[in-house]
Amino acid sequence: MHLHEYQAKDLLTSYQLPIPPYHVATSLSEAEVAIQAEQWRSGVVKAQVHAGGRGKNGGVIVARSPEDLLAATDRLLHMQFSSNQTAGLSLPVNKVLISPLVEIALEYYIAIVIDRKHRCPVIMLSKSGGIDIEEIAEKQPDLLLKIALPSSGKIYAYQLRHIAKFMEWDKLVADRGNHIIRKLLQCFYDNDASLLEINPLVLTKDGDLIILDAKITIDDNALYRHPQLADWYDPSQENIRDVLAKQLGLSYIALDGTIGCLVNGAGLAMSTLDILKLYGGSAANFLDVGGSASEKQIQEAISLVLSDKNVRVLFIHIFGGIMDCAVVASGLVSAMQGQQGSIPTVIRLEGTNVDKGKEIILRSGIPCEFVASMSEGAELAVKLSR
């Protein structure tokens, strides 16, 4: 689960980390009250969306007067924000963050992420923070320091000395930087984060280290341990089908293809996506209904897949071990009877009650093609999608 910047800062503030004052506004009147209370003569207004690239895409506005702060708030509130990180979506801006300007001497980058290749957390640092960090990481990887961390969450003194030398910090700045790094690690581990990114961490002209922007992602599978964070979930920042899938308890990920998929089991679902690609097609979604889905869940899952206007073909791929093929068939019939028009449907059913399942589908009169193998089904689905 992604946090908004203001939520990330709320969390980091609880760890006594150095963050400039900020206010969140959902309206011009709230912004005006905050600006007057703080007596800010200038500042920055930032759209609160679950996406990077705000600085390059009009989501961050620097203002040099109280009037400009209000004008920036008015401009950003309720805009539809998109960037190369929004996966083609336009995200609504329902809140803005307002904070004072900071006199910056240097910008740094710090991130703690889960390195899945090495199966451990990694801290990454760069002397060149700011809006171009992605380009720097790609074109000048030598400017990015990566240090693997133990699962205990500790960082050792020799590692901190290495960081200070790499970042070219003097002793005073290094002491402050070490404190920040330790607190960031504590926050990362305490809250089961999968990403904690500070960009930029700035050295001010007064010699202070301050966090100007923060991005935090919490592991969805650990949210049951953090109900206070789960309450921060913002469904407005997600694809509506992703939101509905969560409400239905389904494992669903929207993709950009044209073949809608309903599969049971994550391994079979991923294999299905792979074989569709092998035959020259592409899936519109990943959807694992698991082994204990009810007829109602199957019906809603199929309706969810077909709500994507890009879907040209439905590929149902079920291996009924725990899953009952008759339940899948009944859910399919209920879903199709509620649809306007028809869509080409390819079905591979194997396992528990397969004959009964096929009988239910055939008796319903739903136009479909039964196949005997995964490869046959994928080839036919790709052909029908063209």
UniProtKB/Swiss-Prot annotation:
<dbReference type="InterPro" id="IPR017866">
    <property type="entry name" value="Succ-CoA_synthase_bsu_CS"/>
</dbReference>
<dbReference type="GO" id="GO:0005524">
    <property type="term" value="F:ATP binding"/>
</dbReference>
<comment type="subunit">
    <text>Heterotetramer of two alpha and two beta subunits.</text>
</comment>
<keyword id="KW-0460">Magnesium</keyword>
<dbReference type="Pfam" id="PF00549">
    <property type="entry name" value="Ligase_CoA"/>
</dbReference>
<feature type="binding site">
    <location>
        <position position="102"/>
    </location>
    <ligand>
        <name>ATP</name>
    </ligand>
</feature>
<feature type="binding site">
    <location>
        <position position="46"/>
    </location>
    <ligand>
        <name>ATP</name>
    </ligand>
</feature>
<keyword id="KW-0816">Tricarboxylic acid cycle</keyword>
<comment type="function">
    <text>Succinyl-CoA synthetase functions in the citric acid cycle (TCA), coupling the hydrolysis of succinyl-CoA to the synthesis of either ATP or GTP and thus represents the only step of substrate-level phosphorylation in the TCA. The beta subunit provides nucleotide specificity of the enzyme and binds the substrate succinate, while the binding sites for coenzyme A and phosphate are found in the alpha subunit.</text>
</comment>
<dbReference type="GO" id="GO:0042709">
    <property type="term" value="C:succinate-CoA ligase complex"/>
</dbReference>
<dbReference type="InterPro" id="IPR005809">
    <property type="entry name" value="Succ_CoA_ligase-like_bsu"/>
</dbReference>
<dbReference type="GO" id="GO:0004776">
    <property type="term" value="F:succinate-CoA ligase (GDP-forming) activity"/>
</dbReference>
<dbReference type="Pfam" id="PF08442">
    <property type="entry name" value="ATP-grasp_2"/>
</dbReference>
<dbReference type="InterPro" id="IPR016102">
    <property type="entry name" value="Succinyl-CoA_synth-like"/>
</dbReference>
<feature type="binding site">
    <location>
        <position position="213"/>
    </location>
    <ligand>
        <name>Mg(2+)</name>
    </ligand>
</feature>
<protein>
    <recommendedName>
        <fullName>Succinate--CoA ligase [ADP-forming] subunit beta</fullName>
        <ecNumber>6.2.1.5</ecNumber>
    </recommendedName>
</protein>
<feature type="domain" description="ATP-grasp">
    <location>
        <begin position="9"/>
        <end position="244"/>
    </location>
</feature>
<dbReference type="GO" id="GO:0006099">
    <property type="term" value="P:tricarboxylic acid cycle"/>
</dbReference>
<feature type="binding site">
    <location>
        <position position="107"/>
    </location>
    <ligand>
        <name>ATP</name>
    </ligand>
</feature>
<dbReference type="InterPro" id="IPR011761">
    <property type="entry name" value="ATP-grasp"/>
</dbReference>
<feature type="binding site">
    <location>
        <position position="199"/>
    </location>
    <ligand>
        <name>Mg(2+)</name>
    </ligand>
</feature>
<keyword id="KW-0436">Ligase</keyword>
<dbReference type="InterPro" id="IPR005811">
    <property type="entry name" value="SUCC_ACL_C"/>
</dbReference>
<dbReference type="InterPro" id="IPR013815">
    <property type="entry name" value="ATP_grasp_subdomain_1"/>
</dbReference>
<keyword id="KW-0547">Nucleotide-binding</keyword>
<dbReference type="GO" id="GO:0005829">
    <property type="term" value="C:cytosol"/>
</dbReference>
<dbReference type="GO" id="GO:0004775">
    <property type="term" value="F:succinate-CoA ligase (ADP-forming) activity"/>
</dbReference>
<keyword id="KW-0067">ATP-binding</keyword>
<comment type="pathway">
    <text>Carbohydrate metabolism; tricarboxylic acid cycle; succinate from succinyl-CoA (ligase route): step 1/1.</text>
</comment>
<comment type="similarity">
    <text>Belongs to the succinate/malate CoA ligase beta subunit family.</text>
</comment>
<feature type="binding site">
    <location>
        <begin position="321"/>
        <end position="323"/>
    </location>
    <ligand>
        <name>substrate</name>
    </ligand>
</feature>
<keyword id="KW-0479">Metal-binding</keyword>
<dbReference type="InterPro" id="IPR013650">
    <property type="entry name" value="ATP-grasp_succ-CoA_synth-type"/>
</dbReference>
<feature type="binding site">
    <location>
        <position position="264"/>
    </location>
    <ligand>
        <name>substrate</name>
    </ligand>
</feature>
<feature type="binding site">
    <location>
        <begin position="53"/>
        <end position="55"/>
    </location>
    <ligand>
        <name>ATP</name>
    </ligand>
</feature>
<dbReference type="GO" id="GO:0000287">
    <property type="term" value="F:magnesium ion binding"/>
</dbReference>
<dbReference type="GO" id="GO:0006104">
    <property type="term" value="P:succinyl-CoA metabolic process"/>
</dbReference>
